Amino acid sequence: MLRSDGAVRLTLGVSYGPRVGRANERQRVSLAPAAGHWAPARAPAGGPGAKLPVKMKGYHDIVGDGGSRVLEQVAEQRTRITDGLAGVRHLVAVGSGKGGVGKSTLTLHLAGALRARGLRIAILDADFNGPSQARMAGVEGALFVPPPSPKGFGVAGGSHKVALPRTTNGIAVFSMGSLIPESESLEFESAAHGESHTWRATREFALLGEILGSVEWGALDLLLFDLPPGAERTVQYADFLGPRTSFLLVTIPSEVARGVVARSVAALSKGPNRILGYVENMSGYYCHDCNAIKPLFSGRGASLALGIPCLGAVPFDPELARHCDRGIPLAELPETPVGRALDHVAQRLLDSLESQ
């Protein structure tokens, strides 16, 4: 990890083959072929009119990855991921399709409700440049990563694993917020100047793969992925994580939010991943003074037409929000309507998982 000008750059363990050169003040990518493949032609001693001895292969002549070992490295990483997650019973990705619906907060409190049932729970904060789980869970600066090696991020000789910090109630948490101060950002370096958008997804998922294969997950009942917002991002994570991962979607009683989540449902339905259902978050707010649920949005019930099961409706509780801001996770759910709603969602989630 390199820090420069307030930015954090991660060096990944996967090599992508291309090397970058500068020509006419512009970034240019050129392949680095292995010996025995093609090489730039050189003029023979016979002069300019002589026949060139080496012919450059065309696109359709190249077999495999051109000697970069990308395919081999991807296969090796997949093996590390499979081995690393061998002790995890259920993988559940929590997505929203739209930001601002309280997905990360719900993920943490749902993890708390599951943990209160005696289950072994971990959270992977997959929003690398907008991590929030570290602060909410109270584990900022608590993650130690072994020095990188040729075998990958956080892996020293292939034997050292990243040990995760835990909340006061025993939830293991991986979040970039435990590594990167809030005043700094995570950057994915590009091989071509001004073209970082074409490389970002590749780099980001390579990093996710390294994390999955390098962390000591151990024996878990559930690993919850807190996904970044965006309908397209949700589908990308489904494709990367594979059919073993089930999805739980979060929305609020708003027509706008419902419409975006409906797009996520439509896109996920085309793939092999199972959609467990959705949670209607912030269905109202809990008034401690009057001990009642008050309306928060005007669109109550607008999200009920998603075509997937509703696992529950969770009202907003200002007290829980204050706990998150201070990084004080609740050791056990309070006896409030919010706590009972979260416990209901946890039970419905477990029932859905067990019915697979």
Residue positions per predicted region:
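Conserved catalytic-core segment of NTP-binding enzymes
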Residues: 210-322
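P-loop NTPase nucleotide-binding/switch module
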Residues: 74-90, 135, 141-166, 174-177, ...
